[in-house]
């Protein structure tokens, strides 16, 4: 079947785990290289640990009164006096618009809701219930501890691959040892 082919592969991450006889002499370990599951049970089987986080910073904080609309199309209206954080990540960076008014991010170790529509270049979060919050604080879209890629994928009705692969070129990659 293989003839004179020197290198043959037909196994990606899932095949490597579940069909080792199909590996031939090369494999394409995709998502498992980053520590994410390609199929149910992969994390335990290989002791996978996710290696990437998606992080930004608060660029602006503002307290608004009750009944204030947030974002385009007035899709969110505050029910109480609310402290709103603006974060410079939007759908052009890979944050799904479907997370508008239903997603969460992590600030100072706590989950806070995304409010209003996710915009092209930014989104807003309700930080009213955080004891301390300042402009410049880290914001995790995912950190693999408090919020995972899998949680985000589920909220978006998709798979972890799509969440990771749609982080755009605009987002700087920082490699650490």
Regions of interest found by a model, annotated:
Residues 1-177:
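Active-site anion/phosphate-binding pocket segments in diverse small-molecule metabolic enzymes
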